Amino acid sequence: MDNVTRYKITESSQSSSQAYYHLSFEMSEQQYYASEHIVRAIRMRQTILLYAVTGAGKTEMMFQGIQYARRQGDNIAIVSPRVDVVVEISKRIKDAFLNEDIDILHQQSSQQFEGHFVVCTVHQLYRFKQHFDTIFIDEVDAFPLSMDKSLQQALKSSSKVEHATIYMTATPPKQLLSEIPHENIIKLPARFHKKSLPVPKYRYFKLNNNKIQKMLYRILQDQINNQRYTLVFFNNIETMIKTFSVYKQKITKLTYVHSEDVFRFEKVEQLRNGHFDVIFTTTILERGFTMANLDVVVIDAHQYIQEALIQIAGRVGRKLECPTGKVLFFHEGVSMNMIQAKKEIQKMNKLALKRGWIDE
């Protein structure tokens, strides 16, 4: 989550650029398919939804559309409700568009340029009035955008009357699905590396955060022995911290993160650098986090909504060099949300196989 307490309105102007970009790999057939729809939406000033599974390669799908928009002088914004997602996406955008002046706007990054090419949290859109010709909204269903009418209004007021909007998410809200014409909903069921989505497995487990439990400890120790990293999701910060204090006695390279943790960005970067083997986390890492050799465990999975479970499962198997992994839903009774999440993942795998967009 982000906020803006002091800001100035950016004076709106137009300026084109060549927007050359670099890709270190060949895009998949599905990515080209999505890219064509994005360019068409920008040209026609349409609203479309990329209903794309986690790990579909949405960031790269945007590149051709970004280039098309910038070459015709469009002001563009790539927006997400979550700071963590903005940080992740902005790195990849800057690495691809090396010669572009890109404003990265969130609570720890301020405006440097004229706002022609912006990557930001939704809160930062208060800086702009009728400025953007093209807006990409990643993780449109994420908190706080999904629950905050003023942020939804900021999206509208920052855009020109005629503009293109490209929504992107693996878990679109029913209201959004009903508002967008069927032909403008682009379903993308495959990951870019053409391997199937990991399907969750259920395990009965009742957490006792006052002692080390053999089942959880054995799984975490096996992960470490197999040189795999593990995200363990909790839906309660207090429970997570109490559990951490117990397991820290046995697992030295263990840490935790949550939305109020001022060191969370540093901890996530340390995880990527191999400093930690296991990280206890809230849903702050359910979106936007990517690394190789990663598996997830969800404590009390029966208490999560379907969308969160799909997003959490989507952390696994995202890298080309490591396209598989484990997703474990620990529960005290299988919930309907758990069943629906698993069904949605299996349905997308089936559709991707039918279209020939995955190998297995």
Show the residue positions of the predicted features.
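Cys/His-rich short segments
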Residues: 1-26
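Walker A/P-loop
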Residues: 43-67
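Conserved interdomain linker/interface between the two RecA-like ATPase lobes of SF2 helicase motors
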Residues: 48, 182-254, 356-358
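Conserved helicase ATPase core of P-loop NTP-dependent helicases/translocases
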Residues: 87, 100-114, 254-282
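Post-DEXD/H (motif II) to motif III coupling segment of the RecA-like Helicase ATP-binding lobe
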Residues: 130-204, 211-213, 218
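Conserved RecA-like helicase motor core of SF1/SF2 enzymes
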Residues: 139-142, 258-261, 268, 272-325, ...
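Conserved segment of the helicase C-terminal RecA-like domain
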Residues: 159-175, 315-344
